[in-house]
């Protein structure tokens, strides 16, 4: 029985073309016959990866495969396909790029001709697959406040999705049993031989009767109409780390839609949506708060209560603080996603200018303005360049 092409390459069903190409090249370099002489198992894995890549790298074939499984691309993906195979029509750029990775860099450097450091680094695990077609991935958006993002949070999500039918236990059969497909005798494949002037060719395709599963439902379950799945609701707990950003996503393996007739579950993709805060702005892992003070407080200095993500804290504003000065409260910002520690809480200080001062206020200001200390020194103001002033704002 053919394995699921996404499983062969070790990628999810929502994988991008670049992710598919990267996964394929890693497998092709690992199992290439030149690196595994007289190894029949490696040869089969190499052919399998070629076949999967030929389908998933082609938009039309991938669409048909996603909709109909192996039956939708039966005649197009032979075991010899793919950019390294005899019958494939893969991207020539991939061919030369992959061969250069395999045989180029290492040989020029005098080391291993295969560059094992690159070949075997990184990578991800593959998921095992039970019988049946895989369930589809499920994508949801999760709104988070800045307070939740700052520390990380555990969320319990109620999700509507396809679940295994509880009447037939997901088999799709009224009796709970599946029978061997009479067309392919349980192999999931059909073979067609044709003779040409070059010899006999055998084309292997997914069985049209069972869709490549090797089993068929004789007596369908009436609750799920033989599909083995139905619409349901489930609860999932997800741990969101501190420091995530809008658009980041987490993939929960096997938490997506159930596969028909015992097929493996798809993945649940949780996309983060950051809710705009009422009084704070985010700048990386720092939090910015705008504080407006009176002219007197700016000149004389003062102590104020400052709101932060963890509550209010006391902060001293020094005398002669200039407009747009940024004061820093360390480690009161957002937790770093990929490192220990937290960002800072930045307080940008500005002066309050009354729009409708009283007559008495105006007279007092006129008297105050007579002082030489209250009039800006134009020469000193222009001694600092523009970029130095900007630097002062964000220092």
Curated annotation (Swiss-Prot):
GO molecular function, one term: ATP binding
CXXCXGXG motif repeats: 165-172, 181-188, 207-214, 221-228
Residues that hold Zn(2+) 2 according to the record: 181, 184, 207, 210
SUPFAM superfamilies linked: Chaperone J-domain, DnaJ/Hsp40 cysteine-rich domain, HSP40/DnaJ peptide-binding domain
Pfam families xrefs: DnaJ (PF00226), DnaJ_C (PF01556), DnaJ_CXXCXGXG (PF00684)
Location within or outside the cell: Cytoplasm
The entry's keywords: Chaperone, Cytoplasm, DNA replication, Metal-binding, Repeat, Stress response, Zinc, Zinc-finger
GO cellular component, one term: cytoplasm
HAMAP family hit by this protein: DnaJ
Known function: Participates actively in the response to hyperosmotic and heat shock by preventing the aggregation of stress-denatured proteins and by disaggregating proteins, also in an autonomous, DnaK-independent fashion. Unfolded proteins bind initially to DnaJ; upon interaction with the DnaJ-bound protein, DnaK hydrolyzes its bound ATP, resulting in the formation of a stable complex. GrpE releases ADP from DnaK; ATP binding to DnaK triggers the release of the substrate protein, thus completing the reaction cycle.
Name of the protein in its database record: Chaperone protein DnaJ
Annotated organism of origin: Prosthecochloris aestuarii (strain DSM 271 / SK 413)
Lineage: Bacteria, Pseudomonadati, Chlorobiota, Chlorobiia, Chlorobiales
């Amino acid at each position: 029985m053919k394995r699921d092409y996404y499983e062969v390459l070790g990628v999810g069903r929502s994988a991008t073309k670049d992710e598919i190409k990267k996964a394929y090249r890693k497998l092709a370099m690992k199992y290439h016959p030149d690196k595994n002489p007289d190894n029949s198992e490696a040869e089969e894995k190499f052919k399998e990866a070629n076949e999967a890549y030929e389908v998933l790298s082609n938009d039309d074939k991938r669409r048909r495969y996603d909709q109909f499984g192996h039956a939708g691309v039966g005649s197009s993906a032979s075991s010899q396909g793919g950019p390294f195979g005899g019958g494939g029509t893969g991207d020539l750029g991939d061919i030369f790029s992959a061969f250069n990775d395999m045989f180029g860099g290492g040989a020029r450097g005098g080391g291993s001709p295969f560059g094992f450091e690159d070949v075997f680094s990184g990578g991800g695990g593959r998921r095992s697959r039970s019988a049946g077609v895989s369930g589809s991935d499920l994508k949801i958006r999760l709104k988070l406040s800045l307070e939740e993002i700052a520390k990380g949070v555990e969320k319990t999500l109620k999700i509507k999705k396809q679940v295994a039918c509880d009447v037939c236990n997901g088999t799709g059969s009224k009796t709970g049993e599946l029978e061997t497909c009479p067309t392919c005798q349980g192999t999931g494949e059909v073979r067609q031989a044709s003779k040409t002037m070059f010899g006999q060719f055998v084309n292997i395709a997914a069985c049209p009767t069972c869709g490549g599963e090797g089993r068929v439902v004789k007596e369908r379950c009436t609750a799920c109409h033989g599909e083995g799945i139905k619409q349901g609701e489930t609860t999932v707990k997800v741990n969101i780390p501190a420091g995530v950003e809008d658009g980041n996503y987490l993939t929960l393996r096997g938490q997506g839609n159930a596969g028909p007739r015992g097929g493996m579950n798809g993945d649940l993709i949780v996309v983060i949506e950051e809710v705009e805060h009422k009084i704070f702005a985010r700048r990386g892992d720092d939090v910015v708060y705008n504080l407006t003070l009176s002219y007197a407080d700016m000149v004389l200095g003062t102590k104020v209560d400052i709101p932060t993500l963890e509550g209010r804290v006391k902060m001293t504003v020094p005398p002669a603080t200039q407009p747009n000065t940024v004061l820093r409260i360390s480690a009161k910002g957002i937790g770093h996603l990929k490192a220990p520690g937290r960002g800072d809480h930045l307080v940008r200080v500005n002066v309050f200018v009354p729009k409708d001062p009283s007559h008495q206020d105006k007279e007092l200001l006129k008297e105050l303005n007579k002082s030489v200390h209250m009039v800006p020194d134009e020469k000193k103001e222009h001694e600092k360049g523009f970029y130095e002033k900007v630097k002062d704002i964000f220092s």
